[in-house]
Amino acid sequence: MNPMIFIILLTTIMLGTFIVTTSSHWFMTWLGFEMNMMAIVPVLMKKYSPRSMEAATKYFLTQATASMILMLAIIINLMYSGQWTITNMENYTASMLITIALTMKLGLAPFHFWVPEVTQGVSLPSGLILLTWQKIAPLSLLYQTYSSVNMNILLLMSLLSIMIGGWGGLNQTQLRKIMAYSSIAHMGWMMAIMVYNPNLSLLNLLIYIFMTSSMFMLLIFSSSVSTLSLSLTWNKAPIITIMSLTTLLSLGGLPPLTGFLPKWMIIQELTKNNSVILPTLMAILALLNLFFYMRLTYSTALTMFPTMNNTKFMWQFQNTNILSMMLPLITISTLALPLTPMLILLN
């Protein structure tokens, strides 16, 4: 792909997201979603192959269906209220349709089937955009309409997403699919707190983007796409492997790493709102995620697949400039929780 065309596509993706996040008009919001979708499809097919074509087609069909449902909900709401304002949601049917459309765009269960398949079919940089930047626009719209969303349905979807995100990743060896199921589970945590404290949901999104970006950048740097290739990075880049392990454990929510912070705050907030059964179930189901991250850490750090002798000592020739660039992002992704008391004392 021509670099100039690629820059234009990335600019359009960012512009579409900014239109959605800053607009208070339903038509402009829908227009931003369409700009975003039409620009991301060529990016997913950047490395042309039958697998990437299939992934881009699945993504396009899912997002186009969600956009049609969203437009139907907008028209129904306009018919009953006579206004294009986002915050003015008076019709129950329109509210339900908008919830379904946005959860389809986010990849929440039971509309999650496209997320692992599309992520596995695209390259690592495209997967990074898909699992981080593409979550911002739907979540910002949910943030604006959370007061009119059906709370019980959203909580049921969130619990189902946490469960499927944990179970789906248990038997996976492909790192992109593991990251996709992790994304489904994290989206479930964000939706669970959205109806009680939407600001906390945005904080969770920010931490999730930091952790997922760190993990994908480490995978891109080490060219790892499976458990086998990740285990061989000990010979190529020991520092990268150590960073990957701590980032994986942070994604699993193991204290005292950064990933434990949003789970801790969400469970605390749900308990304050007299909800006991839901946070208990969420904490139990989160152990599924932690289990496959621990298994991945074990297979990477404590075991080593058979390898050729010519792969040894390659770490001496690695470029350390990229490591220094990634260091701040990885520090935030792993050590934000232990550093929090120090930041409070400094202030």
UniProtKB/Swiss-Prot annotation:
InterPro entries: Complex_I_Subunit_2, NADH_DH_su2_C, NADH_UbQ_OxRdtase_chain2, ND/Mrp_TM
Cellular location(s): Mitochondrion inner membrane
Membrane-related topology note: Multi-pass membrane protein
GO cellular component labels: mitochondrial inner membrane
Pfam families the record matches: NADH_dehy_S2_C, Proton_antipo_M
Keyword Translocase among UniProt keywords: yes
Keyword ATP-binding: no
GO biological process terms held by the UniProt record: mitochondrial electron transport, NADH to ubiquinone
An example Gene Ontology molecular-function term: NADH dehydrogenase (ubiquinone) activity
PANTHER family: NADH-UBIQUINONE OXIDOREDUCTASE CHAIN 2 (PTHR46552:SF1)
Assembly information from the UniProt record: Core subunit of respiratory chain NADH dehydrogenase (Complex I) which is composed of 45 different subunits. Interacts with TMEM242.
Function: Core subunit of the mitochondrial membrane respiratory chain NADH dehydrogenase (Complex I) that is believed to belong to the minimal assembly required for catalysis. Complex I functions in the transfer of electrons from NADH to the respiratory chain. The immediate electron acceptor for the enzyme is believed to be ubiquinone.
Family: Belongs to the complex I subunit 2 family.
Protein name: NADH-ubiquinone oxidoreductase chain 2
Organism listed in the record: Crocidura suaveolens gueldenstaedtii (Gueldenstaedt's shrew)
UniProt lineage: Eukaryota, Metazoa, Chordata, Craniata, Vertebrata
